[in-house]
From Swiss-Prot:
Glycosylation sites: 167
Main location: membrane
Membrane-spanning parts: 48-68, 80-100, 131-151, 184-204, 266-286, 291-311, 371-391
Entry keyword set: Cell membrane, Glycoprotein, Membrane, Receptor, Transducer, Transmembrane, Transmembrane helix
Descriptive protein name: Gustatory receptor for sugar taste 64b
Recorded superkingdom: Eukaryota
Gene it is expressed from: Gr64b
Residues on Cytoplasmic side: 1-47, 101-130, 205-265, 312-370
């Protein structure tokens, strides 16, 4: 690992891209020195993020108005939840931005322990490359999903226009299909479409980026636990002096405090992200028993969106759970310490390792460990069995009519 490969330098470009969508409005996010990172209430980034928040909040108000005037059903409630989740994600990233300068300075201080001898010999984790790979894969897949859903909307709006003989232009039909809540209060103008698409992206981007951000945090923390484990594994079954175990234990406690600091800061984001992912997966599974459509594009967009949500959730768990995985490896390594080398320091270290779970959590409701996969899988299978029993599959027919009532 290069001597200067800190988490801040590895993740700075990713955070800069997120600021394009109004997330984490921190000044000097790409600064070489963490001391230069600032959160200023009167800054262009804050004003830009505030503008995006106002636009999203205004559209949320239009959605509420639409739901009240039309009806509350399964579909409109999912639209409401989408905007609520989006607004909460922006709010939680604002909350995190206020704490981010302090977090980065604390993180940088802990990292200095692992950027010098002997840890530099155990540093092939390559934080930056891993973060870039995760970000590229997740956000590229999210872009494909967004394009498929847009293409799906274009197709369905055109089918509605032609089948139902609606006397509107092609682009107005898209506006009517994509934004029925705005169509009720704002007449169509072509110049509105690029603005609405940009607002749409600021709503869609945080859903995937939040998972990506959690993975980036997990990679940064796991890299240091990996170094600590490698140092302990290097002295496997060797007799080491007490000063060695004292130093290793103190470094572990520094990492543990850092995990607790990060967990307190991003726990609301973790809870929101996994709650949203689970509800979306269950919603799509429910829709899979209902009318999806006979068109290839409709089917492709539906199943890709569902598959992407499942894979993204699993990837987030596996990446973030690597923190806990390395701690468990350290526990295993301590069990192999020879009895003649066992000391008070090793005993204290062993007890501190077993005190509690070292992992990111969703505000204490769950921890990002590998066992979470089994828990979520069991929940989804139970839900699938329940709805398959409730819904009469014999009455399901493929959707061939696209006319909607407003």
């Amino acid at each position: 690992m290069p001597q200067g490969e800190t988490f801040h330098r590895a993740v700075s470009n990713v955070l800069f891209i997120s600021q394009i969508y109004g997330l984490l409005p921190v000044s000097n996010v790409r600064a070489l020195d963490v001391a230069d990172i600032r959160f200023r209430w009167c800054s262009p980034r804050i004003l830009y993020s505030l503008l995006i928040g106002i636009l999203n909040l205004s559209e949320f108000g239009a959605v509420i108005n639409y739901v009240i005037k039309v009806t509350i059903n399964f579909h409109t409630s999912s639209t409401l939840s989408l905007y609520i989740v989006c607004l909460l994600e922006h709010l939680f990233f604002w909350r995190l931005a206020i704490q981010w300068p302090r977090i980065m300075r604390t993180w940088h201080g802990v990292e200095q322990l692992f950027l010098r001898v002997p840890y530099r010999f155990y540093g092939e984790y390559r934080i930056k490359r891993r973060i870039y790979i995760v970000f590229t894969i997740v956000m590229s897949s999210a872009l494909v999903e967004h394009c498929l859903l847009l293409g799906n909307s274009f197709h369905l709006s055109n089918m509605e226009r032609t089948q139902c003989k609606i006397n509107v232009t092609y682009f107005e039909s898209i506006y009517k299909w994509e934004r029925p809540h705005l169509y009720m209060i704002l007449p169509y103008h072509f110049w509105m479409l690029p603005i609405l698409e940009w607002v749409n992206q600021t709503i869609a981007y945080p859903r995937s980026f939040t998972d990506c951000f959690i993975m980036c945090i997990g990679i940064g923390l796991a890299a240091r636990f990996h170094q600590l484990y490698r140092r302990i594994a290097a002295v496997h079954r060797k007799v080491m002096p007490a000063v060695f175990w004292t130093e290793v234990r103190e470094h572990y406690l520094a990492l543990k405090r850092l995990v607790h600091l990060l967990d307190a800061a991003i726990a609301p984001l973790v809870l929101l992200a996994f709650g949203n992912n689970m509800s979306f997966i269950c919603f799509q599974l429910f829709n899979s028993f209902k009318n999806i459509g006979v068109d290839f594009l409709v089917m492709l967009a539906f199943w890709y969106s569902l598959g992407f949500a499942v894979v993204r959730t699993l990837l987030t768990i596996f990446v973030a759970s690597s923190i806990n995985d390395y701690e468990r490896k350290i526990v295993t390594a301590l069990r192999d310490v020879p009895s003649r080398a066992w000391s008070i320091e090793v005993q204290r270290f062993s007890e501190q390792l077993g005190n509690d779970t070292t992992a990111l959590s969703g505000s204490g409701f769950f921890y990002l460990t590998r066992s979470l996969v089994l828990a979520m899988g069991t929940t989804i299978i139970t839900y699938e069995l329940m709805i398959s029993d409730v819904i009469n599959q014999g009455s399901i027919r493929q959707k061939t009519q696209y006319c909607r009532e407003y």
